[in-house]
Amino acid sequence: MHDYQLFTSESVSEGHPDKMADQISDALLDAIMREDLHARVACETLVKTGAVVLAGEISTTANIDIERIVRDTVNSIGYNHSDLGFDGETCAVINMIGKQSPEIAQGVDRMNPEDQGAGDQGLMFGYASNETEVLMPAPIEFAHRLMERQSELRRSGELKWLRPDAKAQVTLKYTNGTPSAIDAVVLSTQHDPDISQADLQEAVMENIIKHVLPADLLHAGTRYHINPTGKFVIGGPVGDAGITGRKIIVDTYGGMARHGGGAFSGKDPSKVDRSAAYAGRYVAKNIVAAGLAERCEVQISYAIGVAEPTSISVNTFGTAKVSAEVIIELIRTHFDLRPYGITHMLNLLQPMYQQTATYGHFGRPGSETAFTWEKTDKAEILRADANI
């Protein structure tokens, strides 16, 4: 168990400028992978008033309409009219994408695909906890669900005055390592100029917060901050610049676990920043699902051009039923953590990445089919081999 009495995590909506950038990068990755599953893609996006700027390195046989994909993605997020300050049909799209360095390619590609080297050096973490049904930390799980609900109400038209940009933050109280109460909720949402703050706060409380958060964790002392600065009409790329990879804690575990520093969006599976982080989640989740530990953090590290991980480490925070040595041996036996092994173990060579770019890459309820790293199909054999 952890020693926190209070722990806070945040999430942001699909209309947050950094998340816009992530979605554009992953939309381009998906479009390329529909034509070329073995493309090398590292696509970065910058969004600011009136412009989308693309940069990075892509080597592919695919022939895609980059500008159209960018515009369609921006429009689908909800920035489709000048009244919102950003219009996918009229914004500038500036393309500065080049090709992957041949020096990197020679370190990754191999005659035998199973010997594929890591696309870069680096360290990645995976994490799981039994404090929620999806084996995620409760603060980030609740924050994501608040943001999903905001999007649902905006897209359905139930709350017509909602706009795409929003943020949520949830502070949980822990007792003996278990969530016992929600201490504070912060929710800020962009809105049309003609909604009063009183009406907005009531609607957010009744239709978002109370709809999402467990009633047994809310109490008389729970503090609510709904649009605490008042008006939030100017948002999205007009209010702030957005860049791919700036919401890596939102994307993962809300700060409850460590992070190796590498972002996910816009990267094909040869980039271990992404694929090994997914594998780390898969390993940790199966360890917890198997009952080997109540909490598990897995670290994996790589050297560029080398297939085998340079290290595999685990931390179970004193909750394990077997030793760390036993768990690591089980990991080595049942999980292929070479880049090629990860790609095929998790079926990562498919165009499904744009859907990961909002509301977290991990712990999405009902996502096990699309997000293969959320499966717990190794739990039974891990439990059997651990003799517990």
Swiss-Prot record:
Record-listed ATP binding positions: 16, 165-167, 231-232, 240, 246-247, 263, 267
Sequence positions that bind L-methionine: 57, 100, 240, 271
Reaction catalyzed: L-methionine + ATP + H2O = S-adenosyl-L-methionine + phosphate + diphosphate
Classification via InterPro entries: ADOMET_SYNTHASE_CS, S-AdoMet_synt_C, S-AdoMet_synt_central, S-AdoMet_synt_N, S-AdoMet_synthetase, S-AdoMet_synthetase_sfam
Enzyme class: transferase
Cofactor(s) required for function per UniProt: Mg(2+); K(+)
Residues annotated to bind Mg(2+): 18
Region Flexible loop, residue ranges: 100-110
Keywords, in A-Z order: ATP-binding, Cytoplasm, Magnesium, Metal-binding, Nucleotide-binding, One-carbon metabolism, Potassium, Transferase
Gene3D superfamilies, sorted: 3.30.300.10
Family: Belongs to the AdoMet synthase family.
PANTHER family: S-ADENOSYLMETHIONINE SYNTHETASE (PTHR11964)
General function of this protein: Catalyzes the formation of S-adenosylmethionine (AdoMet) from methionine and ATP. The overall synthetic reaction is composed of two sequential steps, AdoMet formation and the subsequent tripolyphosphate hydrolysis which occurs prior to release of AdoMet from the enzyme.
HAMAP family referenced in this protein's UniProt entry, alphabetically: S_AdoMet_synth1
Protein name: S-adenosylmethionine synthase
Lineage: Bacteria, Pseudomonadati, Pseudomonadota, Gammaproteobacteria, Moraxellales
Gene name of the record: metK
